[in-house]
């Protein structure tokens, strides 16, 4: 039976930062499309962007945790 690969957290901070940037870009694109959307679609976009903002906050907290773990050698 093959052994599982060890947990490689060495690039987690960078991956999370990319995810934050992509999410910010998605928010901006969604806001641009709102001018062409119906009132119902605008409300759905607003709700989705609120969830995206919450996700960004969680990812930023995870970035801090991962950066601290990196400094302490992932103990």
UniProtKB/Swiss-Prot annotation:
Sorted keywords for this record are: Sporulation
Per the entry, what induces it? Expressed only in the forespore compartment of sporulating cells.
Q: Looking at the Swiss-Prot or TrEMBL record, what is one Pfam family this protein matches?
A: Tlp
Compartments where found: Spore core
Gene Ontology BP annotations: asexual sporulation; sporulation resulting in formation of a cellular spore
Recorded hits in HAMAP family, A to Z, give: Tlp (MF_01506)
Family, per entry: Belongs to the Tlp family.
What is the protein's given name? Answer: Small, acid-soluble spore protein Tlp
The organism is: Geobacillus thermodenitrificans (strain NG80-2)
Primary gene name? tlp
């Amino acid at each position: 039976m093959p052994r599982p690969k060890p947990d490689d957290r060495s690039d987690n901070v960078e991956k999370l930062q990319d995810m934050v940037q992509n999410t910010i870009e998605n928010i901006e694109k969604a806001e641009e499309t709102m001018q062409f959307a119906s009132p119902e679609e605008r409300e759905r976009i607003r709700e989705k962007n609120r969830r995206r903002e919450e996700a960004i906050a969680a990812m930023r907290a995870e970035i801090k945790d991962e950066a601290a773990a990196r400094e302490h050698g992932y103990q």
